[in-house]
Design a protein with these regions (language model features):
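Short strand-turn-strand beta-turns centered on an Asx-Gly dipeptide
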Residues: 12, 29, 74-76
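Short, contiguous acidic and Ser/Thr-rich linear segments
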Residues: 24-36
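Ferredoxin-type iron-sulfur electron-transfer modules in oxidoreductases and energy-metabolism complexes
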Residues: 35-54, 101-251
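Long, hydrophobic/aromatic-enriched structural stretches that serve as scaffold segments
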Residues: 53-54, 69-73
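Short, structured protein-protein interaction patches enriched in aromatics and acidic/basic residues
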Residues: 57-69
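Glycine-rich phosphate/adenylate-binding loop and adjacent beta-alpha elements
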Residues: 74-98, 103
Length: 251
């Protein structure tokens, strides 16, 4: 059975996008080790509300590692020290009694702070709107086996599609680049027959939108790959670069 721990929590508080933020310190006592990180924040918020304060604003939805909403920078790592897991999948047993835990929002020009730990990640939606889809005529769908796809290609596309768009890659990158996200979303479509028709347009449009929204350039430090909760490979970035170069040569 996991032991209870007590620790110091330093949380970034900021009232709005243009307000000046600062860390506030809270003492957490006897938190069970099997408490998830977000449940711990729920406990803290209940204490703050009972004391008449403003609860900490943070993003969450499914709490199952699927939606990508729980975007917290914990002790210098996107989603915390756990590998291959989102914030909501991390439990307090990963920390020691007496630890100091620092919690911040994603730090990137592409993800401005809304309030406290919540950031605006709508830039990702805009990138997807630029080309993260396959244009089709409406009508009855084809049978699943109508277009044969080799297993190795299907596996690569599925691995790329595992990206949940959380933004950890941007938070981890010293340049604030969204290349891992963009390359995963381009790859999951460009690898498949249905996506190849628009492959050139997709690569150019999504990269152009990424640059327009203020994300930085990729310099291959691989921090994004190391911190990605879904273990997305930077081989997708190499594929996107190839697709982009080929597309520009065809212009």
């Amino acid at each position: 059975m996991d032991k209870n721990i007590s620790f110091t929590l330093k949380v970034w508080r900021q009232k709005g996008p243009k307000a000046k933020g600062a860390f506030e310190t809270y003492q957490m006592k006897d938190i069970p080790g099997d408490t998830s990180f977000l449940e711990m924040l729920d406990i803290l918020n209940e204490q703050i509300i009972n004391d008449g304060g403003e609860p900490i604003v943070f993003d969450h939805d499914c709490r199952e590692g699927i939606c990508g909403m729980c975007s917290l920078y914990i002790n210098g790592h996107p989603h915390g020290p756990a590998t291959g897991a989102t914030t909501c999948q991390m439990y307090m047993r990963r920390f020691k009694d007496g630890d100091t835990i620092t919690v911040e929002p994603w730090g990137s020009a592409g993800f401005p702070v809304i309030r406290d730990l919540m950031v605006d990640r709508s830039a990702y939606d805009k990138i997807m709107q630029a080309g993260g889809y396959v244009s089709v005529n409406t009508g009855a769908p084809q049978d699943a086996n109508a277009i044969l796809i080799s297993k190795d290609i299907a596996d690569e596309a599925m691995d790329a599609a595992a990206c949940i768009g959380c933004g950890a890659c941007v938070a981890a990158c010293k340049n604030g680049s969204a290349m891992l996200f963009v390359s995963a979303k381009v790859s999951q479509l460009n690898l498949l027959p249905q996506g190849k028709v628009e492959a050139a347009r997709r690569a150019k449009a999504m990269l152009s939108k990424m640059d327009e929204l203020g994300f930085g350039n990729c310099t291959n430090t691989r921090a994004c790959e190391a911190e990605c909760p879904k273990n997305i490979s930077i081989s997708n970035i190499a594929r996107l670069n190839r697709d982009f170069i080929i597309a520009k040569l065809k212009d």
